[in-house]
From Swiss-Prot:
A Pfam family the protein falls into: HIGH_NTase1
Residue sites binding ATP per the record: 7-20, 96, 152, 175
UniProt gene name: tmcAL
Membrane-crossing residue ranges in chain numbering: none
UniProt entry keywords in alphabetical sequence: ATP-binding, Cytoplasm, Ligase, Nucleotide-binding, RNA-binding, tRNA processing, tRNA-binding
GO MF entries: ATP binding; ligase activity, forming carbon-nitrogen bonds; tRNA binding
GO CC field: cytoplasm
Protein family (similarity comment): Belongs to the TmcAL family.
Domain of life assignment: Bacteria
UniProt protein name: tRNA(Met) cytidine acetate ligase
GO-annotated biological processes: tRNA modification
Enzyme Commission code(s) on record: 6.3.4.-
Localization terms from the record: Cytoplasm
Amino acid sequence: MTITGIIAEFNPFHNGHKYLLDQAEGLKIVAMSGNFMQRGEPAIVDKWTRAQMALENGADLVVELPFLVSVQAADFFGQGAVDILDRLGIDSLVFGTEEVRDYQKIADLYTEKGAEMEKFVENLPDSLSYPQKTQAMWKEFAGLDFSGNTPNHVLALAYAKAVAGRNIKLHPIQRQGAGYHSVNKDVDFASATALRQHQKDQDFLERFMPSVALFEQASKVIWEDYFPLLRYQILSNPDLTTIYQVNQEMAVRIKEAIKTAQSVEELVELVTTKRYTKARVRRLLTYILVQARESDLPEGIHVLGFTEKGRQHLKYLKGQVSLVSRIGKEPWDVMTQKADQIYQLGNPSIAEQNFGRVPIRIETN
């Protein structure tokens, strides 16, 4: 049987995600971000709610990406997620993209010329942002051109890099309906961005979201809920360079900007430069919020939920892979668990995220 991997955030889960799961074959394993997202923001609803939405709509097994995989630039996000799915035995990776290219060919190219390609990136001037360097590399070696608004295409290239040299086939699916950041309401498939913006519009949610009741009942948060906490972290920390990935230049800019910024958005605007993109600045602010430090990724894989089919697969994996289904005295990943505790501070009604939580079981799919 085919075992298909899907890397996702489901922030929140919508019809486009359901379409992706419907297109996937065989046993469907989702590696999903926890409570903080790749572009450096808190999830609108918590990881358990999002895992349940996925399981109700076609996923067989949902596992959690640790914090230091979730909140990373595309390449590291892709690498970390593919590592986890590879250990879970996937033979194909399905993903949505704005431009369906021959990603398999691109992966083969990277297998062959990876070292040379990385050297090319290292030699590019530091005035370029990391995404600009990556795009220059793909243009040079694969003749690829980019427009700035194809984040899924950028992630797809990161997945192509991550599967290079592994026995995993890539299956791109043409993204349906609205673009990634589109807030358009007159489409067949709305984007997650639009759903976050129109979260109080009942009709809109019902049109574009399969598990709408789950979403409506869940406690929701936005970045601004954490602004006082973020401000406190910045003001009270004498040396921000002790935080993961924060360099001297960024530390100075952030300390200066917090004197006048009245919101997270304003802070991001003030700190962003040509070299430091908004997404990168948001990630740095997320690291500061949760006081992230460089740390090893966890050995075990945290299971958020499964169907009967997923349970059978877990049984098969037992003994081959370290699986964590309950977090008790022994931590799974200290960094992720700390991030979860801080996530809970954004809304007092968010349920406990780790202790006493067991995987969600869905009997039928």
